[in-house]
């Protein structure tokens, strides 16, 4: 087995009186592509939101690169890239403005922001749209921007919650290729 990136132990989460997930255990190792499968309402997004520090677990532990997410969330989150079901895009910004803003949120030193933005735009094939408002781009390109914000800080672990949802067949193929590259 490879190097452990994420370790989840006895993870449980309850919404009011209803358990969404109960006693979940798994480990994610370096260089793997993993998926959470299950029916609607099975708790997949709940698990991802907990692993990314968006939601606090009711019970159990999550370790990111050996760091306990509950005890040291800032340090653990430095290793995580996250694209939620609904990408957190600011439609009133250009692609470049948005990624500059995101880079500052992701602990990238000011002197390196420009380089990081250019690099991630190249990786996600969105450089030619850098001066365009996000709201004027197709769903596929908006999804690429969402992925770009998730990987701009070169995280060890990337979580993509339904990254191809709502895209046409050609866009789905493009996004799958992009995911394989990252």
Regions found by a protein language model. Name each.
Residues 100, 104, 111-129, 180:
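Conserved ABC ATPase "signature" region
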Residues 154:
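Conserved catalytic motifs of ABC-family nucleotide-binding domains
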Residues 60-68, 76:
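Conserved ABC transporter NBD signature motif
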Residues 173-182:
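Helical segment within the ABC ATPase nucleotide-binding domain
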Residues 158-161:
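Catalytic Walker B motif of ABC-type/P-loop ATPase nucleotide-binding domains
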Residues 133-137:
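Conserved ABC ATPase signature
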């Amino acid at each position: 087995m490879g190097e452990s990136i994420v370790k989840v132990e006895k993870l449980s989460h309850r919404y009011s009186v209803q358990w969404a997930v109960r006693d979940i255990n798994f480990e994610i190792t370096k260089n793997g592509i993993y998926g959470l499968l299950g029916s609607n309402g099975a708790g997949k997004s709940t698990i991802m939101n907990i692993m990314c520090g968006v939601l606090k677990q009711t019970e159990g532990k999550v370790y990111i690169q050996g760091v306990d997410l509950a005890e040291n969330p800032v340090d653990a989150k430095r290793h995580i890239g996250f694209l939620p079901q609904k990408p957190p895009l600011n439609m009133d910004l250009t692609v470049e403005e948005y990624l500059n803003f995101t880079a500052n949120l992701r602990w990238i030193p000011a002197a390196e922001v420009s380089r990081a933005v250019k690099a991630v735009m190249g990786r996600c094939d969105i450089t030619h749209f850098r001066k365009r408002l996000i709201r004027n781009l197709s769903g596929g390109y908006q999804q690429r921007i969402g992925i770009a914000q998730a990987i701009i800080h070169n995280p060890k672990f990337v979580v993509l919650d339904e990254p191809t949802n709502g895209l046409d067949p050609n866009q789905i193929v493009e996004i799958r290729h992009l995911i394989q590259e990252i």
